[in-house]
Amino acid sequence: MASRDSSAASEITPDVLLRAYACGIFPMAESVDDPSLFWVEPDMRGIIPLGGFRVSSRLARTVRSDAFTVTVNRDFKAVIDGCAAPQPGRDDTWINRRIRELYIGLHDIGHCHSVEVWQDGDLAGGLYGVSLGRAFFGESMFHRARDASKVALVHLVARLLAGGYTLLDTQFVTDHLKSFGAIEVPRLRYRSLLDDSLEGEASFAALPLDRPVTGTEALAIITRT
């Protein structure tokens, strides 16, 4: 289920990408230096049930302290570049030049969003993902300071809950995501959840976009579910 020639990759547009997400598939690259893309549709799909999102007591204290400043869509390109950069335990990345271009294109038309986490004016971590209907597809996250990507995820989930989203797709499940409540569901079950989430519209702007949301505000939304 893959097409790895670079000419096929160049024909993928943001609109084609949105249609692919609506069908339950997403693109990846073998490495940052590989110009081609291939489509992925896992047999078992990772999701975080929004009503079952878990925040540890230690992380909640960090979020509540506002040691980080959290913004949305302030520097999308810096976030995707941070996700593409090597990190401890991960020397390579699947975010190649074409992937970067496509998701910047989705961001430009309002279907891809970033959450930035700042510390003393520097970008300490963040994440980005695709918004379609009432579904949010988490693409990648990174951190340069302890807990920065975790704080980004907490703020993302608060925003999704406030905006009426019903599906948070993580694509795959890692031990890290399991600690937040991530589970795997079979492809048919995932497609049912996806179809339901595409029947309505959610708002990524239900929480303010023009000012940072405090950790206390974010946690209050999560604990109400």
Swiss-Prot record:
GO molecular function: leucyl-tRNA--protein transferase activity
Location in the cell: Cytoplasm
GO biological process, one term: protein catabolic process
GO cellular component, one term: cytoplasm
One Pfam family of this chain: Leu_Phe_trans
InterPro entries, A to Z: Acyl_CoA_acyltransferase (IPR016181), Leu/Phe-tRNA_Trfase (IPR004616), Leu/Phe-tRNA_Trfase_C (IPR042203)
EC number: 2.3.2.6
Purpose: Functions in the N-end rule pathway of protein degradation where it conjugates Leu, Phe and, less efficiently, Met from aminoacyl-tRNAs to the N-termini of proteins containing an N-terminal arginine or lysine.
Protein name: Leucyl/phenylalanyl-tRNA--protein transferase
